[in-house]
């Protein structure tokens, strides 16, 4: 099956405080976006990637990904993440009309191992309509009331943190976005809303989401 990947990277990432769009923040000399796209490439399973970038940063993003030019298309993203995914999906279907599997990947998860990408693709190819990589929750989880007082301790044995890339049969993702509203942060959640089944594969600790300056410092320390 032909596999395409979408990277919605039009956000500004103000929490990172780097003065540039989060996707272009460098870690050890290479941007988060470049590392994320390279991981998709190195999986050996993705035919093409479409990046949705800030409209005024498209030339900069194209320059950043110049070494992967034949593998990547860059399109202007939208005001919301859902807009960017829709725009990237339309471009992916234009560029690779026979695509049957689509991945949606966060540039902020720049260190996701290629093996995780392969596992997600394999699960979709084997029949799962939607797949997410997950890790067990390590922290104790408390449920609180409106005043902030603890109501109960949640059984964490069935809880998982979700990573990316999330994988989908392309028609399933298309249907989910056709039914979606304007704002959503989790693509698999949209599949859940239309009654679709979402399966899991093991994630990886290296696929942490880089959101704050502290996260960035951790990533730099790991690479040092």
Swiss-Prot record:
This protein's pathway: Isoprenoid biosynthesis; isopentenyl diphosphate biosynthesis via DXP pathway; isopentenyl diphosphate from 1-deoxy-D-xylulose 5-phosphate: step 2/6
GO-annotated biological processes: isopentenyl diphosphate biosynthetic process, methylerythritol 4-phosphate pathway
Reactions catalysed, as given in the entry: 2-C-methyl-D-erythritol 4-phosphate + CTP + H(+) = 4-CDP-2-C-methyl-D-erythritol + diphosphate
Source taxonomy: Bacteria, Bacillati, Actinomycetota, Actinomycetes, Pseudonocardiales
Protein name (database record): 2-C-methyl-D-erythritol 4-phosphate cytidylyltransferase
Molecular function as annotated in GO: 2-C-methyl-D-erythritol 4-phosphate cytidylyltransferase activity
Positions bearing the site annotation: Positions MEP for the nucleophilic attack: 156, 209
Underlying gene: ispD
Enzyme Commission code: 2.7.7.60
Similarity-based family: Belongs to the IspD/TarI cytidylyltransferase family. IspD subfamily.
Pfam families: IspD
Function (record text): Catalyzes the formation of 4-diphosphocytidyl-2-C-methyl-D-erythritol from CTP and 2-C-methyl-D-erythritol 4-phosphate (MEP).
Organism name: Saccharopolyspora erythraea (strain ATCC 11635 / DSM 40517 / JCM 4748 / NBRC 13426 / NCIMB 8594 / NRRL 2338)
Keywords: Isoprene biosynthesis, Nucleotidyltransferase, Transferase
PANTHER family: 2-C-METHYL-D-ERYTHRITOL 4-PHOSPHATE CYTIDYLYLTRANSFERASE, CHLOROPLASTIC
Site location (Transition state stabilizer): 15, 22
InterPro entries: IspD, IspD/TarI, IspD/TarI_cytidylyltransf_bact, ISPD_synthase_CS, Nucleotide-diphossugar_trans
């Amino acid at each position: 099956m032909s596999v395409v990947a979408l990277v919605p990277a039009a956000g500004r990432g103000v929490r990172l405080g780097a003065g540039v769009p989060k996707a272009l923040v460098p870690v050890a000399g290479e941007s988060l976006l470049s590392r994320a796209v390279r991981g998709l490439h190195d999986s050996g399973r993705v035919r093409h990637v479409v990046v949705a970038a800030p409209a005024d940063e498209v030339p900069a993003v194209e320059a950043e990904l110049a070494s992967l030019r034949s593998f990547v298309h860059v399109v202007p993203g939208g005001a919301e993440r859902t807009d960017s995914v829709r725009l990237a999906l339309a471009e992916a279907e234009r560029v690779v009309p026979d695509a049957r599997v689509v991945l949606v990947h966060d540039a902020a998860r720049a260190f996701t191992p290629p093996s995780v990408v392969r596992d997600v693709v394999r699960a979709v190819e084997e029949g799962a309509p939607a797949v997410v990589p997950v890790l067990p929750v390590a922290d104790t989880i408390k449920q609180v009331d409106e005043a902030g007082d603890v109501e109960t301790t949640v059984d964490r044995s069935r809880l998982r943190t979700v990573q990316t890339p999330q994988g989908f049969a392309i028609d399933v993702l298309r249907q989910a976005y056709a039914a979606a509203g304007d704002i959503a942060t989790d693509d698999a959640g949209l599949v859940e809303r239309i009654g679709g089944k979402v399966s899991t594969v093991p994630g990886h600790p290296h696929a942490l989401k880089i959101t704050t300056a502290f996260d960035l410092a951790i990533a730099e320390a790991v690479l040092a």
